[in-house]
Regions:
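An N-terminal domain-cap segment
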Residues: 1-48
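A general structural signal for short secondary-structure junctions and capping/turn motifs
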Residues: 1-2, 26, 49-51, 69-70, ...
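Anion-coordinating catalytic cores for phosphoryl-, nucleotidyl-, and glycosidic chemistry
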Residues: 1-5, 45-48, 74, 125, ...
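Residues at beta-strand starts and edge strands
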Residues: 6, 32, 53-57, 77, ...
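Short beta-strand segments
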Residues: 29, 60, 131
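Short hydrophobic-aromatic micro-motifs
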Residues: 33-38, 79, 84, 128-130, ...
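Short, structured beta-strand-loop surface elements
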Residues: 40-110
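C-terminal edge-of-domain segments
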Residues: 95-186
Protein backbone atom coordinates (compact mmCIF):
# COMPACT_ATOMS: atom_id res chain seq x y z
CA UNK A 1 0.00 0.00 0.00
CA UNK A 2 2.79 2.44 0.80
CA UNK A 3 4.39 1.80 -2.59
CA UNK A 4 1.63 3.67 -4.41
CA UNK A 5 -1.49 1.52 -4.64
CA UNK A 6 -4.84 2.45 -3.15
CA UNK A 7 -6.31 5.86 -2.39
CA UNK A 8 -4.31 8.00 0.02
CA UNK A 9 -5.55 10.93 2.10
CA UNK A 10 -3.59 13.26 4.39
CA UNK A 11 -5.02 15.13 7.38
CA UNK A 12 -3.14 17.85 9.26
CA UNK A 13 -4.77 16.76 12.51
CA UNK A 14 -2.96 19.17 14.85
CA UNK A 15 -3.78 22.27 12.78
CA UNK A 16 -7.47 21.51 12.20
CA UNK A 17 -8.74 17.99 12.95
CA UNK A 18 -12.15 18.81 11.47
CA UNK A 19 -10.75 19.91 8.09
CA UNK A 20 -11.35 17.47 5.25
CA UNK A 21 -8.49 15.22 4.24
CA UNK A 22 -6.59 16.01 1.05
CA UNK A 23 -6.28 13.17 -1.42
CA UNK A 24 -2.69 12.64 -2.53
CA UNK A 25 -0.62 10.59 -4.93
CA UNK A 26 2.03 8.70 -2.99
CA UNK A 27 5.14 6.58 -3.42
CA UNK A 28 7.47 4.94 -0.92
CA UNK A 29 11.09 5.91 -1.47
CA UNK A 30 13.84 3.34 -1.04
CA UNK A 31 15.04 5.28 2.05
CA UNK A 32 11.68 4.85 3.84
CA UNK A 33 10.32 8.35 3.30
CA UNK A 34 6.99 8.69 1.52
CA UNK A 35 6.63 11.20 -1.31
CA UNK A 36 3.21 12.78 -1.69
CA UNK A 37 1.80 15.21 -4.23
CA UNK A 38 -1.46 17.08 -3.83
CA UNK A 39 -3.42 20.10 -4.98
CA UNK A 40 -4.94 21.10 -1.63
CA UNK A 41 -7.87 23.53 -1.85
CA UNK A 42 -7.13 27.16 -0.93
CA UNK A 43 -7.46 27.95 2.76
CA UNK A 44 -7.15 24.34 3.95
CA UNK A 45 -4.46 23.42 6.50
CA UNK A 46 -2.33 21.65 3.90
CA UNK A 47 -2.56 24.59 1.49
CA UNK A 48 -1.47 27.16 4.07
CA UNK A 49 1.26 25.02 5.66
CA UNK A 50 4.59 26.72 4.91
CA UNK A 51 7.36 25.09 2.90
CA UNK A 52 10.25 23.46 4.75
CA UNK A 53 8.29 23.28 8.05
CA UNK A 54 7.25 19.86 9.38
CA UNK A 55 3.50 19.48 9.99
CA UNK A 56 2.05 16.60 12.02
CA UNK A 57 -0.20 14.55 9.74
CA UNK A 58 -2.15 11.33 9.52
CA UNK A 59 -1.88 9.35 6.28
CA UNK A 60 -4.66 6.87 5.50
CA UNK A 61 -4.43 4.56 2.49
CA UNK A 62 -7.43 2.47 1.43
CA UNK A 63 -7.31 -0.36 -1.09
CA UNK A 64 -10.68 -1.40 -2.46
CA UNK A 65 -11.30 -4.86 -3.91
CA UNK A 66 -11.48 -5.23 -7.69
CA UNK A 67 -15.23 -5.92 -7.64
CA UNK A 68 -17.04 -3.18 -9.58
CA UNK A 69 -20.52 -4.11 -8.33
CA UNK A 70 -19.82 -3.75 -4.60
CA UNK A 71 -17.53 -1.48 -2.60
CA UNK A 72 -15.32 -3.75 -0.51
CA UNK A 73 -12.32 -2.44 1.41
CA UNK A 74 -9.56 -5.02 1.03
CA UNK A 75 -6.92 -3.34 3.21
CA UNK A 76 -6.03 -0.06 4.89
CA UNK A 77 -2.79 1.41 6.16
CA UNK A 78 -2.56 4.24 8.68
CA UNK A 79 0.36 6.23 10.02
CA UNK A 80 1.16 9.33 12.00
CA UNK A 81 4.13 11.27 10.74
CA UNK A 82 5.54 14.61 9.70
CA UNK A 83 4.91 16.18 6.30
CA UNK A 84 7.30 18.76 4.93
CA UNK A 85 6.38 20.57 1.71
CA UNK A 86 9.33 21.03 -0.65
CA UNK A 87 9.66 23.85 -3.21
CA UNK A 88 12.11 25.37 -5.67
CA UNK A 89 15.41 23.69 -6.45
CA UNK A 90 14.94 21.23 -3.58
CA UNK A 91 11.74 20.00 -5.24
CA UNK A 92 13.43 19.37 -8.59
CA UNK A 93 16.38 17.67 -6.88
CA UNK A 94 14.10 15.46 -4.76
CA UNK A 95 12.09 14.31 -7.79
CA UNK A 96 15.21 13.71 -9.88
CA UNK A 97 16.93 11.69 -7.15
CA UNK A 98 13.92 9.66 -6.01
CA UNK A 99 13.85 5.93 -6.47
CA UNK A 100 10.77 4.05 -5.34
CA UNK A 101 11.03 0.99 -3.12
CA UNK A 102 9.30 -0.92 -5.94
CA UNK A 103 9.64 0.03 -9.59
CA UNK A 104 5.92 -0.41 -10.23
CA UNK A 105 2.76 -0.69 -8.17
CA UNK A 106 2.03 -4.39 -7.56
CA UNK A 107 -1.70 -3.82 -8.06
CA UNK A 108 -1.99 -1.75 -11.24
CA UNK A 109 1.54 -1.93 -12.67
CA UNK A 110 2.05 1.85 -12.79
CA UNK A 111 5.15 3.73 -11.69
CA UNK A 112 3.97 5.53 -8.54
CA UNK A 113 6.64 8.21 -8.87
CA UNK A 114 5.30 9.22 -12.29
CA UNK A 115 1.87 9.96 -10.80
CA UNK A 116 3.52 11.96 -7.98
CA UNK A 117 5.53 13.97 -10.54
CA UNK A 118 2.45 14.73 -12.65
CA UNK A 119 0.36 16.02 -9.74
CA UNK A 120 3.24 18.01 -8.23
CA UNK A 121 3.82 19.69 -11.61
CA UNK A 122 0.14 20.59 -12.06
CA UNK A 123 -1.51 23.90 -11.27
CA UNK A 124 -1.54 24.34 -7.48
CA UNK A 125 0.45 21.12 -7.05
CA UNK A 126 2.65 20.64 -4.01
CA UNK A 127 5.31 18.04 -3.35
CA UNK A 128 5.89 16.76 0.17
CA UNK A 129 7.93 14.24 2.10
CA UNK A 130 6.42 12.23 4.96
CA UNK A 131 8.60 10.66 7.62
CA UNK A 132 7.23 8.17 10.10
CA UNK A 133 8.32 5.36 12.39
CA UNK A 134 5.38 2.91 12.36
CA UNK A 135 2.57 1.86 10.06
CA UNK A 136 -0.67 0.13 11.09
CA UNK A 137 -2.08 -2.32 8.56
CA UNK A 138 -5.64 -3.68 8.53
CA UNK A 139 -6.13 -6.55 6.08
CA UNK A 140 -7.62 -10.01 5.73
CA UNK A 141 -4.91 -11.34 8.07
CA UNK A 142 -5.93 -8.95 10.86
CA UNK A 143 -4.34 -5.84 12.32
CA UNK A 144 -0.58 -5.49 12.53
CA UNK A 145 1.94 -2.79 13.31
CA UNK A 146 5.23 -2.48 11.44
CA UNK A 147 8.36 -0.33 11.79
CA UNK A 148 9.26 1.41 8.55
CA UNK A 149 12.67 -0.32 8.66
CA UNK A 150 10.90 -3.69 8.82
CA UNK A 151 8.89 -2.81 5.71
CA UNK A 152 12.01 -1.81 3.80
CA UNK A 153 13.93 -4.96 4.81
CA UNK A 154 11.70 -7.41 2.94
CA UNK A 155 14.64 -9.70 2.15
CA UNK A 156 15.65 -10.19 5.79
CA UNK A 157 15.92 -13.61 7.43
CA UNK A 158 12.85 -12.83 9.56
CA UNK A 159 10.77 -12.13 6.46
CA UNK A 160 11.79 -15.47 4.96
CA UNK A 161 11.02 -17.31 8.20
CA UNK A 162 7.47 -15.94 8.42
CA UNK A 163 5.89 -16.06 4.96
CA UNK A 164 2.97 -13.74 4.35
CA UNK A 165 -0.56 -15.06 4.06
CA UNK A 166 -1.27 -12.37 1.44
CA UNK A 167 -2.09 -13.33 -2.13
CA UNK A 168 -0.22 -12.00 -5.12
CA UNK A 169 -2.12 -9.63 -7.43
CA UNK A 170 -2.30 -12.40 -10.07
CA UNK A 171 -3.71 -14.89 -7.54
CA UNK A 172 -6.36 -12.35 -6.51
CA UNK A 173 -7.40 -11.80 -10.13
CA UNK A 174 -7.50 -15.57 -10.78
CA UNK A 175 -9.70 -16.10 -7.73
CA UNK A 176 -11.97 -13.22 -8.74
CA UNK A 177 -12.41 -14.65 -12.25
CA UNK A 178 -13.13 -18.13 -10.86
CA UNK A 179 -15.83 -16.79 -8.53
CA UNK A 180 -17.33 -14.64 -11.29
CA UNK A 181 -17.48 -17.67 -13.60
CA UNK A 182 -19.68 -19.51 -11.07
CA UNK A 183 -22.35 -16.81 -11.36
CA UNK A 184 -24.92 -15.61 -8.86
CA UNK A 185 -26.00 -17.98 -6.12
CA UNK A 186 -29.65 -18.44 -5.27
Amino acid sequence: LLAGSGSAAVTAYRIDPSAPAAFVAHALRADGRILVAACPPQGTPLAIAPDDVAVDIRLDITLDAAEPGVRITAATAHLLGSLTWVEGEDRALLLASSRASACHCAIVGEDPLERVREIAAGSGGRLGVITCERVMLHCVSGVSSHDIEEILDIDSADAAAAPSASWSPQAIMDAHEAVSAVGQLG
